[in-house]
């Protein structure tokens, strides 16, 4: 009896060990994360502050803030010290929240179509989607993702109607750092977070 149980468990472990671990594709990953966001936005029982907090958590799951920041700064990333980078990451995230938070919360049940994956380079893919507005207009909304060391697909750029979030901010940061210092850039971001004009 005991011998049979041991053999059975051994076979089970062998089968489990031989089974391939399922990894979600980039499109599946984006669809799952976007649907989580939509679930929050459609929840009429949640107040705005509660929605913002839940969206903040989902943002951390969906995006890689350091990779996004690196791409937005481009070569200028190397101009920042480790301490400046550690301050830049949360500051920039707060700037993004202030800039796009209200727009996301204004979502009014538009339909989202998940179309295809387009390879960019090794380990990087663009997931192409379309937002169908209430006026029957199609808005291209693409997510650029990369596969991190743990094998998870994370967003590092969003392209809406051919306008890249990364390139938009890189242009702004290049202009600031061409004449100023990393500390001056951080001060500009601090003021943006506080809602002050720069």
For the regions a protein language model found, what residue spans apply to each?
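Bacterial N-terminal signal peptides
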Residues: 8-17
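Bacterial N-terminal signal peptides that target proteins for export
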Residues: 1-9
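Surface-exposed, charged secondary-structure patches
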Residues: 98-139, 187, 192-198
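Low-complexity, intrinsically disordered terminal/linker segments enriched in charged
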Residues: 157-198
